[in-house]
């Protein structure tokens, strides 16, 4: 439509200028709201790739750990105190994949939180609680493996279902109490009120943690990590000594087959090796994140956002690693997966199927 002087209000140059300004101006999480957070400046192609990578991790964490839990709980051969501890660990990792990773995925890719302030706090509680629970489970599993390898014949009387239940209960209760109290009491933000106020925007969900609690978090990671490394160092020394003793005995006596004690010791060493790899994967996944948290807290939050997101997702991906480790090292787990996927566990008496090679 022409103006009074016969000219058009929108020329080609003005349209191009408007489009250029629109392209250069930052996109907001909520365009029509004041103090809206700014969206991440990723291209559509980059967003698609990130969603695929992060989404794959979440699906793998849920499906893989669900297979671990189903295998252990369904097949009677796997009903042991140690395996119940492993199933509980899988439950913690499953919950990370179910309640934490999908929402963190959207926040990481979009730079926005679309799930409300209430779930923002709850999401942070789930994040801290379930990841802490994984750490404590792995710590107790290392203690279990040490007992099993050091004295495999007495082990069944020392690590009973009651002991396993106490370990599981402690791991869950302590983690949940710690995670929820840290977030809902506001203890983590004490002394950071001005910073929190300055950074608060609509569509954001970042929990501020002061130096004291960052240091406490690091210690809560470091102490169990040192315990696990110490215990597994002892385990491998014992395993090496046992292997040397068995080799000497095999040279001295022409045995047609291994003794029962040797077979048990061999099986426990293999289990310790597999779970030791799971522990190493956990430590390697989470150590960079905790080190960065310490650096950030004491040097003024200098870590670029994309670096923080990379470290966080390396840590999250650990929740998907354990099922892959079990599938690689445990033939019984591969057989259990096949039975579950093909639906054979729905048949009568499927729980009594022999999963171990003769």
UniProtKB/Swiss-Prot annotation:
Glycosylation sites: 34, 210
Topology relative to the membrane: Multi-pass membrane protein
Gene Ontology terms: cellular component: plasma membrane
Disulfide bridge map: 37-201, 120-205
Stretches in topological domain Extracellular: 1-47, 105-123, 188-212, 296-309
GO BP: G protein-coupled receptor signaling pathway
Keywords: Cell membrane, Disulfide bond, G-protein coupled receptor, Glycoprotein, Membrane, Receptor, Transducer, Transmembrane, Transmembrane helix
UniProt topological domain (Cytoplasmic) ranges: 69-83, 144-166, 234-274, 334-358
Subcellular location: Cell membrane
PROSITE patterns in the cross-refs: G_PROTEIN_RECEP_F1_1 (PS00237), G_PROTEIN_RECEP_F1_2 (PS50262)
UniProt feature coiled coil, ranges: none
A matching Pfam family: 7tm_1
Record field: transmembrane: 48-68, 84-104, 124-143, 167-187, 213-233, 275-295, 310-333
Top-rank taxon: Eukaryota
Gene Ontology molecular function terms on file: trace-amine receptor activity
Family, similarity comment: Belongs to the G-protein coupled receptor 1 family.
Domain notes: In addition to the well known disulfide bond common to G-protein coupled receptor 1 family, trace amine-associated receptors (TAARs) contain an unique disulfide bond (Cys-37-Cys-201) connecting the N-terminus to the extracellular Loop 2 (ECL2), which is required for agonist-induced receptor activation.
Protein function: Olfactory receptor specific for N,N-dimethylalkylamines trace amines. Trace amine compounds are enriched in animal body fluids and act on trace amine-associated receptors (TAARs) to elicit both intraspecific and interspecific innate behaviors. Ligand-binding causes a conformation change that triggers signaling via G(s)-class of G alpha proteins (GNAL or GNAS).
Name this protein carries in UniProt: Trace amine-associated receptor 7g
Naturally occurring in which organism (per UniProt): Rattus norvegicus
Lineage: Eukaryota, Metazoa, Chordata, Craniata, Vertebrata
